[in-house]
């Protein structure tokens, strides 16, 4: 729906009488004023005219109107999107006979033939108006003609209707559809229903009328009558919301440093320098109260907040954090590395601002010395500079201490070149903390595995040894069996046979169907974005030095029918690869060319290539060690899911999931992902979920949500929500 060309009128109305409003959009522009080729010719024309000393003697040659008539012009079809009943909208303009090509602007709906469905009248520029008769059959409706006080048209009056358990409301407003006025009737589609449960008219003066004896499949007249009008009843007190944002005395605010990734990598799909902040919860001063650490961007120190007995969080200044503020904190784990009874800190450093191999990509380990004194140990962990994000903790070898999986997020300035991930085995002894990189011995496949964003330790086969799951951007979900702590074997093909690649951002586990094993929820980009993908039409990226200038270039592509095309246009593509301007002299020739015609089959075959086959966020149900995928509910697909929290929110014995996300820093030609306010996925205990909207749950998380953690505040359960370049949000769960 985001690409409806030059749109004018937009009408929401129930054209198929199923009780759900559809959307009709007129579009078209007489001259293509945004045509880049004409714009370039235009500059040449006016420069020639400006610099011609004999301009006044060449009026015919420089006749402006004649020149402007050369501006391209193309008639286009309008759009009718059918409401899929809380599952989005589907374009039906061809199927429903509305594929005439026109220059359209004004549009109205009205039941012109009084047969119970809405017809369309469309105004077309320099052409006859179009009248479309609606031939819907086997559906029911009810209509109302409202007569207000003193025989006036009661603009602003609302009609509330309940039928077969479904609620609808419409407000009488005539000015609709771009400089147009629709019929003064109010029209409700009823689908198969023939029984009305309740009709209430809320007049524009605030009074109400309850309507009885109205007839289905006809138009009913309702007249404002002082004798039948009663005042609105006072609203009952709203039910306590499950989620409630609480005020903070000294909230953490993430302060993203200014850096433009697109200066070096013009064709990136999104920034890779804005992936924070990290967030972790733990008791860092051994007072039995949860504290938290929030990661800083470059130039912002890591922030430690200690919980007081009254539930207030106080920021504590840690000198070593101030000293290390020029690292970017993208992953944090709080755990006792040396079994001395206090909590240490591991921080994964990341970002995209510096060259590969820079020391600012070295991870950091801070040993807890007690009394909130932390010291950085450069000998505790390998000083390998990899831009990371994900860290997960597990005693994979059951030797009594905690080991680490550390995910490589990216190779700076070489997107999407794969990064290496690591397994660090804890070899601490006698109070001396030491982690050894055992990736080569335990799981060599982690070398250059991809752009890792998330991991999870799960006992997949019930042998009591926790196995490793890894996922990321442009990756499939990878499953690695723990062979009794000795090493790991990939079992992806055995446990997830319908696996597909995505932009995975988070994995969480839980027994969502109450059958005794562990299921999974995975967050993906979602289905409400410019980029779309399927197995038949994958979304791809290619990496190569396409123009042979000793720098890597990337090309994003999509499939239309059986042909592959570049996502980005001539202008952006030529900024990265200037040779494109020489090969394609104008925008039209580039727009008409396939990917192979632009870059050649040979160089594409030689390129590093990844593809995505689905952007759906999914639930993976465990059936005796084999996972099957189910799409999460529609409202969980409206934006990407960056963070997932699993718990029984309402105490009904079934696990639920709280999901948050958004992606604000997309490339300039792609609107940002910002449709999520967070969603409570209420579990039914059978592997199903119902998405509860903010107005039902009270869960409202505006912004670019990056991380969420549960934290105990006195005797209450709260949710911490960390957002990029925004203040941390604290939400009480009632």
Where are these regions (language model features)?
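Solenoidal tandem-repeat scaffolds enriched in leucines and small polar residues
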Residues: 382-428, 432-458, 465-466, 471-473
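Beta-propeller blade repeat segments, especially FG-GAP/WD-type strand-to-loop junctions
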Residues: 36-41, 77-90, 129-139, 301-316, ...
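Blade-loop segments of beta-propeller domains
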Residues: 312-335
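Beta-propeller blade termini
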Residues: 8-17, 105-112, 275-286, 306, ...
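Short, conserved, GDST-rich strand-edge loop motifs in beta-rich repeat architectures
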Residues: 29-72, 348-360, 407-419, 523-537, ...
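Gly/Ser/Thr/Pro-enriched helix-cap/hinge segments flanking short amphipathic alpha-helices
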Residues: 66-79, 83-278, 487, 527-538, ...
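Asp-box/WD-like beta-propeller blade repeats and closely related beta-sheet repeat scaffolds
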Residues: 325-331, 350-396, 418-419, 436-444
């Amino acid at each position: 729906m985001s690409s409806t060309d030059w749109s004018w009128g937009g009408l929401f109305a129930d054209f198929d009488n199923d009780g759900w409003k559809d959307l009709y959009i007129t579009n078209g522009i007489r001259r293509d004023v945004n045509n880049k080729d004409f714009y370039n010719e235009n500059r040449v024309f006016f420069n020639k005219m400006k610099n011609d000393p004999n301009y006044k003697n060449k009026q015919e040659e420089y006749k402006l109107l004649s020149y402007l008539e050369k501006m391209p012009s193309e008639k286009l079809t309008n759009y009718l999107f059918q409401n899929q009943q809380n599952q989005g909208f589907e374009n039906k303009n061809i199927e429903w006979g509305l594929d005439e090509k026109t220059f359209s602007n004004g549009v109205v709906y009205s039941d012109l033939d009084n047969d119970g469905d809405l017809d369309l009248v469309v105004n077309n520029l320099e052409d006859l108006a179009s009248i479309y008769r609606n031939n819907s059959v086997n559906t029911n409706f009810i209509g109302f003609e409202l007569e207000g006080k003193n025989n006036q048209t009661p603009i602003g009056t609302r009609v509330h209707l309940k039928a077969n358990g479904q609620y609808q409301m419409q407000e009488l407003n005539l000015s609709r559809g771009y400089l147009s006025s629709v019929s003064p009737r109010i029209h409700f589609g009823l689908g198969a229903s023939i029984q009305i449960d309740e009709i209430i008219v809320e007049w524009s003066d605030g009074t109400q009328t309850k309507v009885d004896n109205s007839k289905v499949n006809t138009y009913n007249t309702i007249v404002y009558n002082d004798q039948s009008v009663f005042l609105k009843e006072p609203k009952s007190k709203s039910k306590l919301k499950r989620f409630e944002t609480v005020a903070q005395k000294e909230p953490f605010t993430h302060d993203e440093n200014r850096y433009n990734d697109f200066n070096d990598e013009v064709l990136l799909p999104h920034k890779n320098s804005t992936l924070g902040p990290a967030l972790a919860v733990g008791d860092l001063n051994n007072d039995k109260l949860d504290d938290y650490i929030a990661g800083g961007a470059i130039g912002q120190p890591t922030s430690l907040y200690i919980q007081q007995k009254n539930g207030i969080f106080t920021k504590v200044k840690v000198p070593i954090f101030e000293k290390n503020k020029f690292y970017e904190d993208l992953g944090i784990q709080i755990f006792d590395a040396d079994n001395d009874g206090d909590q240490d800190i591991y921080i994964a450093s990341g970002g995209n601002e510096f060259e590969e191999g820079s020391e600012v990509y070295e991870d950091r380990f801070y040993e807890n010395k007690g009394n909130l004194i932390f010291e950085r140990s450069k000998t505790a962990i390998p000083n390998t500079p990899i831009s990371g994000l994900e860290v997960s903790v597990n005693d994979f070898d059951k030797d009594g201490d905690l080991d680490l999986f550390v995910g490589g997020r990216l190779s700076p300035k070489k997107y999407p070149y794969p990064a290496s991930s690591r397994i660090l085995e804890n070899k601490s002894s006698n109070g001396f903390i030491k982690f050894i990189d055992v990736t080569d011995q335990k799981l060599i496949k982690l070398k250059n595995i991809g752009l890792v964003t998330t991991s999870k330790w799960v006992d997949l086969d019930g042998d009591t040894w926790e196995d490793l799951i890894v996922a990321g951007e442009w990756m499939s979900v990878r499953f690695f069996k723990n062979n009794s702590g000795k090493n790991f074997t990939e079992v992806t093909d055995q446990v997830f046979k319908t696996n597909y690649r995505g932009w995975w951002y988070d994995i969480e586990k839980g027994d969502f169907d109450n059958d005794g094993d562990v299921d999974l929820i995975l967050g993906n980009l979602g289905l409400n974005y410019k980029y779309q993908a399927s197995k038949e039409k994958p979304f791809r990226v290619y990496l190569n030095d396409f123009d042979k200038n000793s720098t890597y270039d990337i090309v994003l592509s999509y499939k239309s029918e059986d042909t592959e095309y570049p996502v980005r246009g001539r202008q952006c593509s030529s900024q990265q690869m200037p040779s494109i301007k020489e090969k394609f002299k104008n925008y039209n020739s580039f727009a008409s060319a396939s990917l192979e015609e632009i870059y050649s089959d040979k160089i594409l075959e030689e390129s590093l290539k990844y593809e995505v086959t689905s952007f759906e966020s999914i639930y993976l149900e465990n059936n005796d060690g084999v996972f099957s995928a189910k799409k999460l509910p529609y409202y969980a697909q409206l934006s990407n899911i960056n963070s997932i929290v699993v718990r029984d929110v309402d105490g009904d014995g079934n696990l639920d999931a709280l999901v948050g996300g958004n992606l604000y820093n997309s490339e300039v030609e792609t609107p940002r992902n910002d449709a999520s306010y967070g969603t409570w996925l209420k579990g039914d205990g059978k592997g199903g979920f119902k998405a509860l909207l903010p107005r039902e749950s009270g869960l409202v998380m505006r912004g670019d949500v990056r991380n969420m953690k549960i934290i105990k505040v006195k005797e209450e359960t709260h949710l911490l929500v960390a957002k990029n370049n925004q203040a941390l949000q604290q939400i009480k769960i009632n």
